[in-house]
Amino acid sequence: MDRTEAMPHFMTHVVKPARVLALMRLEKDFQTHKNTLATNWTNDFQRICNQLGREQIRKNKPLLGHLTFSLLRTELAVGRAIYVVEATDSSWFFDRNPCQTEYDASWALRYLNQMKDEIDSGRKAYMRAITLPDVEQIVLREAVHFHQYVIQLARYALPTAIQSPEFAALSTEDVVEIRVGEYMDVSEVVYKIDRRVRDAQSVREWIDEGSEQEYAYEVFDRLDLSRGEYSEMDFRYSRFEHSDLSDARLNGCVLLGTRWNHSRLVRADFSYSLLFGANFDHSDLSGADFGGIQASKGLLEPDSWEMPGFWEISFAESNLSKASFIDAQLAEAQFRKANLAGVNFAGADLTNANFTDAHLREAVFVGASIASADFTGADIDGASFSVKDRDKLNLDERQQAAVLWIEAEREEAYLHELFYPVSR
């Protein structure tokens, strides 16, 4: 086999399997230890802020507008998983005097080294058609996949890390973007601060313009956006904290990683939206519609890798009374201490969902997938479950006696009426 034939064969039969194996290992590590990783990331972030703060004073630097973590391929080529961290003013790339320090991402890029070992071992079967320099070049190209986990961890950790006194001590603009990318190349916002006082009406008018790209990674905190029509829009990774979106229509939206903490969302319509990794903790969602949403934790396809998996959607300590989650995908969702009285979960995937200490009186679980769901301490008086799921539920004696068990015939009739209603 000559080199022309060998390289495509090598990429398909050695590199691709090694990539998938390494990324699946990294995915498992990230999902299992993400809270520990986030704590370590926050500690690094505090150290970075301290160093940048000293640099800012030494250089008599004006207000900072951007904090950018950039992968250095030159460092990667010599085995170091180093990102340069630059604090710049509002001019960003045009700031000729940035404050700089470093971030070590070995926790993620060590899996790239494992992949390198795998493909270096695999190249030997190709004799001299695949060389060590070929492997080095392939590894540098493959780094982009592992780099995505650095982006994902920053997104996960920053809502907490940003509260640190070390960051507060920096002198910053009213609008600050924290970004992760490659050096002098494409980067993306992982957290944005916007302290400007904005008028709700002007924000509504801006959204009404309907730009396809402008609403992702945005800040919509402390605004009255109630009764708005926002369906089929892309708000990925935006924040709506302490805001009012009661009676708003957000069905069919891209809402990945959005944050809605401490907001009023009464009767809001989120049906059929993508809500992977969203956070609704401490919010009022009574009567809200989450029917058909996609929000399960993990990879989009459990047996293949296309992008990093999402963390779980969370409704901890929220009011969801009379809300609807019919046919929603909610594997590993967090409902800890939430008010879920009268909620309809019919047909939903609630595998490994957490309902500890939740209020679930008269909630409907008929036709739902509830394997390994945790109901410890939950009040489930009058809640209805499919009788076929009795052995799958880990309920105490009081809970077992308090629920309604729906027989198969009644379940089938109920679900048929719910999903295939007949006009009368």
What are these regions (language model features)?
Residues 71-75, 89, 182-184:
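Short, flexible loop/turn elements at secondary-structure junctions
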Residues 78-87, 189-191:
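A short acidic (Asp/Glu
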